Amino acid sequence: MSRLEARTRYLQAGQKRLGKIRKRGFFMETAATKNYLALSFGCLSPTRGEEYLLDQIKKKHDLWNKLVEKDREHREKVRQVMVFESETTKKIKELEEELNSLREEIKNQRKTKRTGKVDLTDQKARIEEIKPQLKQLKEKFKEERSFIFEARKQELAQLEKERWAVVKELGKGSGLYWCNLEDVVNSYDIGRKKAKAAGGEMRFHRWDGTGKVTVRFQKGLPVNEMFSCTNNLLQIDPVDKDAWYNPVRAIRRKKSRTRVRLRACSENKKPLFIELPVVLHREIPEDALIRTASVIREKVGMRYRYKLNLVLEILGENTNRILPALEGTAAIDLGWRTVKDGLRVACLVDDKGHSEELILDNDVLHEFNKIKDLQSIRDNLFNETKAKLMELLKTLELPDEAKERTSHMANWRSQQKMLRLHQYWRENRLPGDDEVWEVLEYWRKREIHLYEWQENLRDQVLRRRKEIYRIFAAKITRKYKTIVLEEFTLNKTVQKPNPEEGPAGTLPANRNRFIAAISEFRNELANACRKNHVEFTYVPAENTTITCHKCGHKEKFDAAAQIIHTCSTCGELWDQDYNAAKNLLAFSQKGGVK
């Protein structure tokens, strides 16, 4: 077994174990639990070895796209092996065609009458008849498919063997350093599993000059050895203790500046380093082992940004750090609802009656709206420039290449096409084209300014939101022993309703969902729970909003239109989000935790 294959199988087993842990929640409580610390430091542009970095991330990008191409071919071969015709598949196909036809008919009626209120009694009745039939037939199809799978198991095993052989062959010919090769193969393995579970295909990546190079230490690299600059994978020039402990901020800033060298690749078994100026804004624990180190190249607007990421295993006295004596349980209801002070993302209720909420204030919402405004300004400028150019080009005698480049200008939707036209015109000026050139040059300057503004603002507001979520997660995980969340699939909130269920959601609601980014908050909360050894569990979310927490009466109401609701049975007045959090808390205390 090759080194790459053994490493990949080990990581696959780890992913499987992690998946099982996530399904039932996680609870880090043993004294032997290892503590890991992830640190990130800002870097300036490389002073040496940038060509090695670019070479490795380009090769990683190319290998990924080749793996995706081969995986799609493999998936097609599997489908060919598993294809079979039966009475069940024929009936499923007929019913699905009828269902799609009815839904298209509903859409056309709404479009014709320009309203969501149309008489759809007959179509809805037929759809309700088709749905249970389809469900039953698909269950039967699964049983038939399982028999086919068993019958063709050897063929599928052979295809899987061939796929893995192709992966190894592509890896050998990629020219990647072994750490970077493992990084791509591991990402590929995780990506293909996610695509398979979602019923989709893996996606190709567009080359934009971003990526990372990584080094990994299987037994760990002592921090002192890294600062001694003798290791052939990672070196950081040592800094004085004043970089972190001097009372004068200016001295701390000056002393924390140093250089990092990370091995990007090899030549004749000799290391080729990338060197970058780095700011060690916080101390790296001396009694720690470095497990992985990465230099990441990101793009913000028209420029590239670099950072150094370190993952450390804490040793010595800090291995089992003393945590505060946590007690109590808190339940959190997630969502996105506009309130007076901003956008409410979460409501928390604990077992002592305390409640609080997480709100993205109006300043954050204003910044998100400004991003949208800048996009609108760019689009209007683009459309106005197109209209001017089409009129001006009519007055010029254009060569064939210029005619070809501008023939479909009226249908352009991308600013990139206009930038390519600007570049072409700069290199191929024509007699009497001064007005055309002025229009193009004015547009380019304005476009670059607006684009830089938009992308930098986007970067700032996303980082600001993440910091808000981190602070809130850190605060509650240092207070409670158990955190309870509702169990629901976030991607279901993105799916549009079927036509028979009503018109599609409004744009503001969809935009608020994007601004809230519930998945990001949930990830930050999960990370904080792991770090502080807090139990993190899920309970079913069904009916938590419509069930009164005081009397238990279930009553359907328009949850989107009203935040405050009065129970028709007991007369209790409650906020529906806090009500849901109280129901989650009560359910978890009754042993309903998953």
UniProtKB/Swiss-Prot annotation:
Show the segment(s) annotated as RuvC-I.
330-540
Stretches for region Target nucleic-acid binding (TNB): 541-575
* Chain positions covered by the region annotation Wedge domain (WED): 212-314
Names of required cofactors: Mg(2+); Zn(2+)
| UniProt-annotated binding residues for Mg(2+) | 577
Which note does the record give on the cofactor?
Answer: Binds only 1 Mg(2+) as opposed to 2 usually seen in other Cas12 enzymes; lack of the second Mg(2+) results in loss of target DNA cleavage activity.
Q: Which GO terms describe its molecular function?
A: DNA binding; metal ion binding; RNA binding
**Residue ranges of region Recognition domain (REC1-N)?**
1-85
Identify the residues that bind Zn(2+). 548, 551, 567, 570
List GO BP terms, alphabetically.
defense response to virus
Q: Which UniProt keywords apply?
A: Antiviral defense, DNA-binding, Magnesium, Metal-binding, RNA-binding, Transcription, Transcription regulation, Zinc
The residues forming a coiled coil are none
Per the record, the domain of life is Bacteria
Remarks, miscellaneous? Part of a type V-M CRISPR-Cas system.
**How are the domains described in the entry?**
Has a bilobed structure, with a recognition (REC) lobe and nuclease (NUC) lobe. The REC lobe (residues 1-314) is formed by the discontinuous recognition (REC) and wedge (WED) domains, while the NUC lobe (residues 330-594) is formed by the discontinuous RuvC and target nucleic-acid binding (TNB) domains. The crRNA-single-strand target DNA duplex is bound in the central channel between the 2 lobes while the non-target single stranded DNA is bound to pockets in the REC and RuvC domains.
According to its UniProt entry, the function of this protein is described as:
CRISPR (clustered regularly interspaced short palindromic repeat), is an adaptive immune system that provides protection against mobile genetic elements (viruses, transposable elements and conjugative plasmids). CRISPR clusters contain sequences complementary to antecedent mobile elements and target invading nucleic acids. CRISPR clusters are transcribed and processed into CRISPR RNA (crRNA).
Descriptive protein name: CRISPR-associated DNA-binding protein Cas12m
The species this protein was found in: Thermanaerosceptrum fracticalcis
As recorded in Swiss-Prot or TrEMBL, the protein's gene is named cas12m
